[in-house]
C-alpha cells in the first residue's frame, strides 16, 4: 500500500495542528492535509474525510471550517485532499470550461476521486491512529457529487454529511452527474444529514429534494436554509459536524 509522506510537522494554531502530506496515487501525486488536536491523536480515534467544493481545494475556507471545527468542537481529526484537477493537482477555477471538462464524464471523474479517497483512507488507517469502524464523510456541493458515489461504495464510511446538490439544475445539466447520482444514491446506507439551500441557483429545489428521497438509508434527516448555493450559514456546517460526531462517538 502507498505510504504517506508528511511535509514536516506542520503548524499549530489555536489548539489545532495542520499537517500536509502526499501519497503517490495511480495517476498522480495525491496532496492532502490533516487537522488534529495539538496534543496528539489518541489511539483508536475517529476520523472524518472532508470533500471540497468545485474549483476549491483542500484548504478552502469552508473546508478549514469543517476540519478545524471537528477538532475544536469534538476532538475528532479530519483530512482533506485536493480533488482531481484541483489545488496542487491542477488548480482549475470553479464553473470554468476546464472545470466542466473534468465533469464531462461524471463516472470517470468520480471513479478517479473515489480511488484516491480509498487509497488515502487505507494509508491513514495503516498508521494505527484511527478506528476503522469510526470513519465519517463530510462534503457539500462537489463534495457530495464525489461523496455520494464514494459513500455508496465505501463500507468503511459509517456516517455522512451531504448536500448542496441535486439531480437537476444548471450544474447537472452540463454533465452526466445527475444520472450517476440517481443510480448511486439508493446505495447509500449509512446515517446521513442532508443540507440544502432553499434558493440554490445551481441545483433546483425539486432536484435536491428528489436526491434526498433517493438516498437508500432509513436514517436520514433534511435541513434547509434560505439563500443561494454559496450562502450556507456556519450553523449548517456546525449541524453537519455535530451529526457526524454524535454517530462516531455513539
Predicted regions and their residues:
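Catalytic active-site module of serine/aspartate enzymes centered on a nucleophile-bearing elbow/loop
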Residues: 226, 234-250
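Alpha/beta-hydrolase active-site loop
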Residues: 97-128
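The serine-hydrolase catalytic nucleophile loop
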Residues: 55-67, 83
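Short beta-strand element of the alpha/beta-hydrolase
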Residues: 43-53
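The feature captures the conserved acid-bearing segment of alpha/beta-hydrolase catalytic domains
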Residues: 168-224, 230
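Conserved alpha/beta-hydrolase
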Residues: 68-92
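N-terminal cap/lid segment of alpha/beta-hydrolase-fold proteins
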Residues: 1-43
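Alpha/beta-hydrolase fold nucleophile elbow
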Residues: 128-141
Amino acid at each position: 500500500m502507498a505510504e504517506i509522506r508528511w511535509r514536516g510537522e506542520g503548524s499549530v494554531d489555536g489548539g489545532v495542528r495542520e499537517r500536509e502530506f502526499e501519497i503517490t496515487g495511480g495517476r498522480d501525486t495525491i496532496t492532502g492535509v490533516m487537522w488534529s488536536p495539538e496534543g496528539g491523536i489518541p489511539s483508536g480515534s475517529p476520523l472524518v474525510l472532508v470533500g471540497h467544493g468545485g474549483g476549491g481545494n483542500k484548504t478552502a475556507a469552508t473546508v478549514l471550517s469543517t476540519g478545524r471545527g471537528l477538532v475544536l468542537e469534538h476532538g475528532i481529526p479530519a483530512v482533506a485532499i485536493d480533488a482531481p484537477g484541483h489545488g496542487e493537482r491542477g488548480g482549475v477555477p470553479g464553473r470554468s470550461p476546464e472545470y466542466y471538462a473534468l465533469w464531462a464524464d461524471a463516472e470517470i471523474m468520480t471513479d478517479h476521486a473515489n480511488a484516491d479517497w480509498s487509497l488515502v483512507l487505507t494509508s491513514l488507517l495503516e498508521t494505527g491512529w484511527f478506528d476503522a469502524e469510526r470513519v465519517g464523510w463530510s462534503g457539500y456541493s462537489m463534495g457530495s457529487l464525489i461523496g455520494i458515489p464514494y459513500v455508496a461504495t465505501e463500507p468503511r464510511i459509517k456516517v455522512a454529511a451531504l448536500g448542496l446538490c441535486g439531480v437537476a439544475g444548471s450544474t447537472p445539466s452540463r454533465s452526466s452527474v445527475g444520472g450517476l447520482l440517481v443510480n448511486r444514491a439508493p446505495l447509500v446506507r449509512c446515517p446521513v444529514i442532508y443540507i440544502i439551500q432553499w434558493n440554490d441557483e445551481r441545483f433546483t429545489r425539486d432536484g435536491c429534494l428528489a436526491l434526498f428521497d433517493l438516498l437508500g438509508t432509513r436514517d436520514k434527516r433534511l435541513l434547509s436554509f434560505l439563500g443561494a448555493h454559496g450562502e450556507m450559514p456556519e450553523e449548517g456546517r456546525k449541524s453537519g459536524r455535530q451529526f457526524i460526531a454524535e454517530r462516531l462517538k455513539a
